[in-house]
Each structure stands twice: as C-alpha cells, then as structure tokens.
A protein has these predicted regions:
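Hydrophobic helix-and-loop "lid/oligomerization" segment in the mid-to-C-terminal part
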Residues: 1-76, 81-110
Length: 110
C-alpha cells in the first residue's frame, strides 16, 4: 500500500502473479479495500487488481469524505456511487494503472 497527499489517499495493488500463485479469486480480495480504508487519515482508498495476464486492471474505490469516486471511475468507463465505485483501467503494467488512478484522484481532490 502506498500513501499519497499526506496520507489522505491510499492505493493498494494486487498483481496477477500474486493472485495466481496463491489461487485467489476476485471474491477473495474484496476486503482489501477495508484494509486501505482503516489507515488513520485515509479519506480515499483504492485497490488495483490484475485478475488475468491481460493488461486490464480492475479498480475499487471508496471515499469516507465528500469526494465523488464515481466521477473518477467514470473517467475510465466505470461507475458506482459517490462513496463506492469501480472501473477497469487499461495500462501496460499495474504500476502504470495505479499511477493513472492516482493522477485522476489527485486532480479532483481539494
């Protein structure tokens, strides 16, 4: 997990290699977002997962403040609600996907 914006944003990544080696399924990873949200000071949390070897990355976003994560998800063709949303990010690597998400969030954060 990496913290940004003085600890207000937390982004966790789960690469395909880790998922495949451990036999995880998408449903097994649902509580990761809660780990990121539990860090003191985190207002927006995201988990980026690579579920297959393809260069498609699924992101889950949550907000504990008046920050519309659905707007961020919509930028990548996703959707959801103000405080809970998701999307698929196309990128060359999981780090690139996380960086795209970080940039989209920080651009909207006040």
């Amino acid at each position: 997990m990496t913290l940004f914006m003085g600890g207000r944003l937390a982004i966790m990544t789960m690469p395909y290699e880790v998922i495949a080696e451990n036999g995880f399924r998408d449903g097994d990873l649902g509580t990761l977002i809660d780990v990121a949200r539990s860090v003191r000071g985190v207002e927006v949390a995201a988990v980026v997962k690579q579920l297959t070897a393809e260069k498609k990355f699924r992101a889950s976003l949550r907000s504990s403040v008046d920050f519309d994560v659905a707007e961020v998800a919509a930028e990548f063709g996703g959707g959801g609600h103000t405080r809970a949303a998701g999307c698929t990010i196309l990128a060359g690597s999981i780090d690139e996907a996380a960086e795209k998400l970080q940039n989209a969030i920080t651009a909207r954060f006040e």
